[in-house]
């Protein structure tokens, strides 16, 4: 007899009360996300499924939820695990503690370094975790054709991966020129996703309402890049599922939530996109988004629906997202609806969090191993020289807690015909070094906003191609930072003015992920922040994550690649020194 048949027979026998349930949650106030109503009910669970809601009393295990509130497990509709710097197994430990029982992830960070091998590694690690981890295949590796990433993934490379049971579609399509022009390989990627029974996620940063219509015509059905109510509303009106983002840098919830109404709320879900482990530990994940939405005036019933059923249906996941017979037993028991205070988390019928504490005995972590590509770079001091004549320069202006940048036009004073740090205007040198193929490509630019007093810092986390990016007040400090992250096999390093290493975070898995428990990673990140505060006066934003997005050319306005400045709006490379 097949496992599915046995499971079905067991579920029916339990639902008809011929046998006792494995577990019953009794006397709780249960949210029906289909109509937003609450009712005091008992929930019967058999194996990993809910088999009935109502008059059930006999079970091997009773959970008393008197005075508590019961909602479906939360779903993160779009997340890059790599941005947490931990493996999928470690991600599961922190997310389940926050009531997140399923995630939909795009492994395009590791794919940009290690190609298909990187994707398969993440799928394998996801299967080891207690979390349900669904994968969308990276659509744009590299993000745009001119990027020097560690891999180039064509439609033919991705197609075999649709055979993996946890792969459910094509991830955020960010190469909008390829879509608009009908570029052959991009259209093939979209076609393969749809033919496989999957769906296609969008990445519509800066797209107009008319351009959103083009995305819809191409079969792209979701977007997580809305930063204003108007952008979110335009996508919703076009028929898109809108994922409202609350990450470490991209904190869009309060700017977007006003677009949600009782009549259109079923088109909205929540996502984190990119969130550091430190923020996952202090704020939470989707539970934090729900809390923000409720505080902003969204009815709790709608907020919890957005965090569960809406996300599940947007991703065509028909067995999660609700507390109903036949659905997977992914359940969160709350002490408070408004504060989203979590008491118990049940994953596939098993209690994994009780009294707000994780049951560590259930988390048998297996050490992740991955043969990372060697870092190939030979940057020299001469590569960092930035000649100037007039001193009229283009400068990247960081926007704290945003991935967009300002394109600044400033005047600096050349020092013997080249740029030297302008402390008064807070302008320092920024460098991107190609690390995958030993091309020798080095992009040099200028950035304002880090308020560095001395030293430098560097990281191999540099979206999306993940070359080495560094900023510093001297070429010597920049070179030291680059050399250190190379020596440790990838990671982040802080250097002081005396060229001493103040702190680091080794990321041996593709220069993106640690192989350590998330608590250790968090301590290392704290050390980096402390080190940064000793060489900078800037506060109120994450400097490492901010730096990592200054290299992403598919986000406005001015970015730096290993080939130089890229102007998003003109879609062209430009020089540091202005011609006029």
What are these regions (language model features)?
Residues 1-41, 45-46, 96-98, 281-297, ...:
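Active-site microenvironment of metallo-dependent hydrolases
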Residues 118, 152-172, 178-243, 250-271, ...:
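Histidine/acidic residue-rich metal-binding segments in metalloenzymes
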């Amino acid at each position: 007899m097949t496992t599915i048949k046995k499971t079905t027979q067991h579920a029916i026998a339990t639902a008809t009360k011929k046998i006792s349930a494995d577990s019953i949650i009794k006397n709780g106030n249960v949210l029906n996300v289909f109509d937003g109503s609450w009712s005091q009910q008992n929930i019967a669970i058999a194996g990993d499924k809910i088999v009935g809601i109502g008059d059930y009393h006999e079970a091997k295990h009773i959970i008393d939820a008197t005075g508590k509130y019961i909602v479906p497990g939360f779903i993160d509709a779009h997340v890059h695990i790599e941005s947490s710097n931990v493996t999928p197994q470690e991600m599961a430990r922190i997310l389940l503690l926050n009531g997140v029982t399923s995630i939909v992830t795009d492994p395009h960070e590791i794919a940009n370094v290690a190609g298909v091998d990187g994707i398969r590694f993440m799928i394998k690690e996801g299967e080891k975790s207690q979390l349900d981890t669904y994968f969308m295949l990276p659509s744009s590796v590299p993000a745009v054709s001119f990027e020097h990433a560690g891999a180039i993934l064509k439609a033919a490379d991705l197609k075999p991966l649709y055979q993996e049971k946890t792969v459910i579609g094509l991830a955020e399509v960010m190469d909008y020129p390829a879509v608009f022009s009908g570029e052959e390989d991009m259209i093939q990627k979209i076609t393969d996703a749809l033919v496989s029974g999957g769906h296609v996620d969008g990445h519509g940063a800066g797209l107009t309402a008319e351009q959103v219509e083009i995305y819809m015509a191409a079969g792209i059905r979701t977007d997580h890049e809305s930063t204003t109510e108007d952008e979110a509303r335009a996508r919703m009106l076009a028929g898109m599922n809108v994922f409202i983002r609350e990450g470490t840098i991209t904190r869009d919830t309060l700017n977007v939530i006003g677009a949600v109404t009782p009549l259109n709320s079923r088109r909205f879900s929540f996502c984190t996109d990119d969130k550091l482990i430190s923020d996952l530990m202090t704020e939470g994940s989707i539970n934090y988004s729900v809390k923000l939405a409720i505080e902003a005036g969204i009815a709790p019933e709608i907020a919890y629906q957005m965090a569960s059923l809406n996300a599940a249906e947007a991703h065509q996941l028909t067995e999660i997202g609700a507390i109903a017979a036949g659905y997977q037993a992914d359940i969160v028991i709350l002490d408070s609806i408004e504060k989203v205070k979590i008491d118990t988390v049940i994953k596939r019928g098993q209690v994994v969090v009780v009294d707000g504490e994780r049951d560590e005995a259930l988390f048998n972590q297996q050490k992740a191993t991955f043969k990372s590509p060697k870092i190939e770079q030979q940057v020299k001091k001469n590569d960092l020289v930035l000649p100037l004549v007039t001193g009229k320069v283009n400068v990247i202006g960081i926007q704290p807690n945003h991935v967009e940048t300002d394109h600044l036009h400033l005047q600096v004073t050349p020092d013997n015909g080249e740029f030297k740090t302008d402390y008064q205007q807070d302008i320092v040198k920024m460098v991107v070094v190609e690390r995958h193929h030993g091309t020798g490509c080095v992009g040099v630019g200028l950035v304002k906003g880090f308020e560095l007093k001395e030293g430098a810092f560097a990281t191999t986390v540099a979206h999306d191609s993940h070359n080495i990016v560094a900023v510093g007040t001297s070429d010597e400090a920049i070179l030291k930072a680059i050399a250190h992250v190379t020596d440790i096999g990838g990671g982040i390093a802080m250097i002081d003015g005396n060229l001493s290493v103040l702190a680091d975070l080794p990321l041996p898995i593709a220069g993106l992920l640690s192989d350590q428990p998330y608590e250790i990673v968090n301590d290392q990140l704290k050390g980096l922040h402390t080190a940064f505060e000793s060489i900078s006066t800037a506060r109120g934003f994450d400097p490492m994550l901010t730096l990592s997005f200054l290299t992403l050319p598919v986000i406005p306005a001015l970015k730096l690649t290993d080939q130089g400045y890229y102007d998003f709006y003109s879609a062209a490379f430009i020089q540091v020194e202005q011609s006029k």
